[in-house]
UniProtKB/Swiss-Prot annotation:
ATP binds at residues 73-80. This is Protein RecA. Can catalyze the hydrolysis of ATP in the presence of single-stranded DNA, the ATP-dependent uptake of single-stranded DNA by duplex DNA, and the ATP-dependent hybridization of homologous single-stranded DNAs. It interacts with LexA causing its activation and leading to its autocatalytic cleavage. InterPro entries: AAA+_ATPase, DNA_recomb/repair_RecA, DNA_recomb/repair_RecA_CS, P-loop_NTPase, RecA-like_C, RecA-like_N, RecA_ATP-bd, RecA_C_sf. HAMAP family: RecA.
């Protein structure tokens, strides 16, 4: 085939593709189909998780808009605290959030302590799994909600199980419910840039000798549809004056469709206060060489500023000017890493 014939054939194919795209856009809307390389679709909008360490581990600076996120781990590991901090960050940007309290366990006082405007937080305490996920679907389709948190997947009990007797077998009902709901809401979330955080627990599979015996409720659909999956574990207790004042937690990004996965973030959750942002800044400043450590002393711009980590955190907490200066340098380093 000559070069002219090949060129004419390519032009003809391009015309057909262009005509087909126009037909699809006319029928389903301007954003229904496009080239993957179109810049506006490649740039991922994000919002902060409320933790500098987690934002860094995610590789894109936060959670992605219009996506499904799963935060799972054992009880009292900090899953709900991370989700509540994320709601507070959404509200700081004048966004709207909803909390689907399936467990009926939200603490308004704690939420307020984390910076949430509880007067502007939508909350629902549904009676069944179907009702909870139907509410998520309606909120997603409204286009007015930036973030929906579902706490938790394990508590999404299907109506058939609620209405049945204790002796009735209900194997697979929850998995089928989740699969159907996620198929239904994924398109609305992407179109309206609404994100959903599903908080999940861990269970142990019976009879597993080799490999990881842990699994999460809700079947495989959530693992498949989630763009981000975070595994949250408590590592150690934080002691202050011989009393436990909080927990050190370890967050592993086990799935990430937008950046390299398997990165780990370590942070502290202080009881009644939430994530210790001053401790995170102290740790990240060392990682990015904004602060230097020699022995027990921490130095900044060649000058010793604190002896010991706790005194450094206290210094950052009391000196807002120093905190902002160090934090901005960390942000610059993080932005260089993202670009």
């Amino acid at each position: 085939m000559s070069e002219n014939n090949q060129s004419n054939q390519n032009n003809q194919i391009n015309k057909i593709i262009k005509s087909t795209i126009e037909e699809i856009e006319k029928k389903f809307g301007n954003e229904s189909i496009m080239l993957l390389g179109q810049k506006e679709k490649c740039d991922v909008d994000v919002f902060s998780s409320g933790s500098y360490a987690i934002n860094s581990a995610l590789g894109i600076g936060g959670f992605p808009k219009g996506r499904i996120i799963e935060i799972f781990g054992p009880e009292s590991s900090g899953k709900t605290t991370i989700a509540l901090h994320t709601i507070a960050e959404i509200q700081k940007k004048n966004g709207f959030a909803a909390f689907i309290d399936v467990e009926h366990s939200i603490d308004p006082v704690y939420a307020k302590n984390l910076g949430i405007d509880i007067d502007n937080l939508l909350i629902s305490q549904p009676d069944s799994g179907e009702q909870a996920l139907e509410i998520v679907d309606i909120l997603a389709k409204s286009g007015s909600i930036d973030l929906i948190v579902v706490d938790s997947v394990a508590a999404l009990v299907p109506e058939a199980e609620l209405n049945g007797e204790m002796k009735d077998q209900s194997i697979g009902l929850q998995a089928r419910l989740m699969s159907k709901a996620l198929r239904k809401i994924t398109g609305s979330l992407s179109k309206n840039k609404t994100s959903v955080i599903f908080i999940n627990q861990v269970r142990e599979k019976i009879g597993v000798v080799f490999g990881n015996p842990e699994t999460t409720p809700g079947g495989r659909a959530l693992k498949f549809y989630a763009s981000i999956r975070l595994d949250v574990r408590k590592s150690t207790n934080i002691m202050l004056n011989n009393d436990i004042s909080g927990n050190q937690i370890r967050v592993k990004v086990v799935k990430n469709k937008l950046a390299p996965p398997f990165k780990i973030a370590e942070t502290e959750i202080i009881f009644s206060k939430g994530i210790n942002k001053f401790g995170e800044v102290a740790d990240l400043a060392l990682v990015h060489d904004v602060l230097q450590k020699k022995g027990a002393w921490f130095s900044y711009n060649g000058n010793n500023i604190a002896q010991g980590r706790q005194k450094l955190i206290a210094q950052l907490e009391s000196n807002n000017e120093l905190f902002e200066e160090i934090f901005q340098k960390i942000v610059e380093k993080e932005n260089q890493k993202l670009s």
